């Protein structure tokens, strides 16, 4: 009898999981556009570069509380994010060219 009760317990857990999954599926999913995500990523790259440039200007002007290592770290972050953006662009262009060269 305990084996049957164990199986019934597992079945009830599976049913509860299935019902919660159905409830989550019925909720409206936010639409995420590719263009919106790309624009947001470009904005983050731009913000990173602007912050690094501002930090470097503050250090150059001798403002207190701005350390050289912070400036160098911000400049490297900006450089890496720009290189990442360039590589993403290159991959997108390559994918576009591949799609355009496909036979219809």
UniProtKB/Swiss-Prot annotation:
**Subcellular localization(s) per the UniProt record:** Bacterial flagellum basal body
What are the GO MF terms of this UniProt record? Answer: cytoskeletal motor activity; structural molecule activity
User: What do the Gene Ontology cellular component annotations say?
Assistant: bacterial-type flagellum basal body
Key words, A-Z: Bacterial flagellum
Source organism superkingdom: Bacteria
Carries keyword Ubl conjugation? no
Per the record, the major location class is: other
A biological process (GO) of this protein is: bacterial-type flagellum-dependent cell motility
**Which PANTHER family has this protein been placed in?**
FLAGELLAR HOOK-BASAL BODY COMPLEX PROTEIN FLIE, PTHR34653
Protein family according to the UniProt entry: Belongs to the FliE family.
What is this protein identified as?
A: Flagellar hook-basal body complex protein FliE
- Origin species: Escherichia coli O9:H4 (strain HS)
Q: Which gene encodes it?
A: fliE
């Amino acid at each position: 009898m305990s084996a049957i009760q164990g199986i019934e317990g597992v079945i009830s857990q599976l049913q509860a999981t299935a019902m919660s999954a159905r409830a989550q599926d019925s909720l409206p999913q936010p639409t995420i556009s590719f263009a919106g995500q790309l624009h947001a990523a470009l904005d983050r790259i731009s913000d990173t570069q602007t912050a690094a440039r501002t930090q470097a200007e503050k250090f150059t002007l001798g403002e207190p509380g701005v350390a050289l290592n912070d400036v160098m770290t911000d400049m490297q972050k900006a450089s890496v994010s720009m290189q990442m953006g360039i590589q993403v662009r290159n991959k997108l262009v390559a994918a576009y060219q591949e799609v355009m060269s496909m036979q219809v």
